Amino acid sequence: MSNFTAEDKAAITSLWGKVNVEDAGGETLGRLLVVYPWTQRFFDSFGSLSSPSAIMGNPKVKAHGVKVLTSLGEAIKNLDDLKGTFGSLSELHCDKLHVDPENFRLLGNVLVTVLAILHGKEFTPEVQASWQKMVAGVASALASRYH
């Protein structure tokens, strides 16, 4: 059963249709790595993450950010089954990568910040509430393997 109302779904999908995944993805992952530097430990293979400018200009950060937001796009298509949508990713992040599930919540909050920056007045409090609900649902689905 979904916790998303018809209004939530409309707010999420309407804004998502305007999101440039390449721009928002790189910005989101880059900001996560700058604001929460301990998350960098999962990205040793990305090369230099020595400064905010190195992180924000790193092509591997941008590419992985695109991958993350592309995955989020799949979630948006399956809001009624986030746990099922992220089952294999939850397993990967838990069993192989050993990512602290709190990082999923942090990433979601950074994404909401980026969307607010990129979409300005269109990112109303109501739209934000729907997106917060969605990123919390995604974080919970990604953390499901940990429980």
Swiss-Prot record:
Tissues where this protein is expressed: Red blood cells.
Molecular function in Gene Ontology: haptoglobin binding; heme binding; hemoglobin alpha binding; metal ion binding; organic acid binding; oxygen binding; oxygen carrier activity; peroxidase activity
A GO BP entry: hydrogen peroxide catabolic process
Domain named Globin: residues: 3-147
GO cellular component: blood microparticle; haptoglobin-hemoglobin complex; hemoglobin complex
Family that this chain belongs to: Belongs to the globin family.
Taxonomic path: Eukaryota, Metazoa, Chordata, Craniata, Vertebrata
UniProt keywords, alphabetically: Heme, Iron, Metal-binding, Oxygen transport, Transport
PROSITE patterns the record matches: GLOBIN
Purpose of the protein: Gamma chains make up the fetal hemoglobin F, in combination with alpha chains.
InterPro entries reported for this sequence: Globin, Globin-like_sf, Globin/Proto, Hemoglobin_b, Hemoglobin_oxygen_transport
CDD domains: Hb-beta-like
Coiled coil region boundaries: none
UniProt-recorded name of the protein: Hemoglobin subunit gamma
Binding residue positions for heme b: 64, 93
Subunit structure: Heterotetramer of two alpha chains and two gamma chains in fetal hemoglobin (Hb F).
